[in-house]
Amino acid sequence: MIANVIAEAKLKGACGRIDDVQSVASLTELMFSPQGREFCQNTKFLRVDRLNHIADEAEENNVFIGKRNVLTTSHKSAFIGSKGRVLCSGTEAIYNIIVADNSHVEIVATNYAVVMVTSINGTYNITKDNTARIL
């Protein structure tokens, strides 16, 4: 299953790091890298119809494909054709959130959280306290 996604990414011009991808976990890790986010933005690669067959395994890595009513506190999460809420709190790491393919995400940022949002044909609303920062 993952081989088809890798082959399509190569055809669309993914960076050389795609050659190191052996699993959905390593694919999702690459997706959150600066190069991965740029590739996904430029090619609109993150689509439900392209990735639905890896949805269950992707969800184990906080990548939600075609899901509803998702609630997560993960520092890295992606929503692809999904709806959900991300609760961001604290300074342990920067929250990296990808919102793609008509997803809608509510982001709640508190307690000095730093949040980076990448929107690829998705929408999001942010509620934050005076300490949180959005990049």
Regions found by a protein language model. Name each.
Residues 1-101, 106-135:
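Short, glycine-biased loop/turn motifs at secondary-structure junctions and
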